[in-house]
């Protein structure tokens, strides 16, 4: 069974805070800043290579999507942690973009699971 859900989320939030503040030690695969830069570079690539007439599908993890949204919304780093904890597996987030801006239209939708016989399939990790 493992730890209670609340304890898991608290530990995850604490770990992400320490990662964000560059307080983790050891051989980390990526710093918070490198992760942020990588996601921003992907967003910039999409805005440069595609026009507002194109449809672009982005498939990603919740963490990368939360960071993408942070950049799109010009939000604080704390927002990434909060968004990441809310993102449901297989959710759909919809936005519009051009070469200057990304605008979010919807976030974290699960229309394919949003019915009584599929509610148990909604998961977060």
PLM feature segments, named:
Residues 20-24, 47, 77:
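A broad detector of the eukaryotic-type serine/threonine protein kinase catalytic domain
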């Amino acid at each position: 069974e493992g730890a209670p859900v609340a304890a898991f989320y608290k530990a995850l939030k604490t770990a992400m805070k320490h990662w964000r503040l560059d307080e983790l030690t050891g051989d980390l695969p990526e710093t918070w800043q490198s992760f942020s830069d990588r996601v921003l570079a992907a967003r910039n690539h999409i805005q440069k290579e595609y026009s507002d007439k194109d449809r672009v599908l982005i498939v990603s993890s919740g963490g990368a999507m939360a960071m993408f949204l942070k950049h799109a919304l010009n939000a604080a780093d704390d927002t990434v942690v909060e968004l990441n904890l809310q993102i449901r597996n297989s959710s759909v987030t919809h936005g519009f973009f051009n070469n200057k801006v990304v605008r979010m239209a919807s976030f974290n939708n699960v229309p394919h699971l949003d019915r009584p016989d599929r509610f148990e399939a909604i998961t977060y990790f």
